[in-house]
Amino acid sequence: STHLQGQLVAVHPAYDDAFDGFAAPEVRGNPQARQEWAVNQLFMAAQASQHLGLIAHATFSGALAWPYMYPWPQRPAGLVETAFDELAKRWTPILNAFEDAGVDVCYEIHPGEDLHDGVTFEMLLERTGNHPRCRMLYDPSHYVLQALDYLEHIDIYHDMIKIFHVKDAEFNPTGRQGVYGGYQSWVNRAGRFRSLGDGQVDFQGIFSKMAQYDFPGWAVLELSLIHI
């Protein structure tokens, strides 16, 4: 996977300092050099995936529009569209490299990324001309935390899902906080990750859906333990 490198393909300036540590030391503090380094890392990842005999590769999309996720203050007309146009421009050469390698690029649908739900995935897919290597990594824990119907999501996108993370989570909103979490630590958030079986994800339903649609990939266990 290239989650950190994919993140650096598209970084909004507001996050420059936070993400700079993901890059090689020689390109830190230089956003353009950092992006070029990240893109080159993805090109090499395409070749490495091919050599390893992989058919799917996991990554993040990065984010140019995420700081404007909530529509207040009112977003300037065309801002989101411009951001996704640029995102597609940056990713299309990478997708082409993975096409040459015979490997799918599976974007983990994740908060903090411009691709954080089905709609935003479609926005990039359309701008890449429905690129045959633009695909999805399904992780239900990230959908629980935003109250998205993760079972219907499989019905809609089963043809796009090529990697599956088995990760549990819970969402327990109160009269004091909800989806946004009130800037609290992970332990004190309404939505948080849990050990497999300790959360609210209906894995029986998910595996039934995956079997129904003959999912061809692995079910990869991911643990993000919150000690409570």
Identify the role of each PLM range.
Residues 41-56, 149-162, 204-212:
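Short amphipathic alpha-helices and their capping/turn segments at secondary-structure boundaries
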Residues 218-224:
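Short acidic/histidine-rich active-site segments
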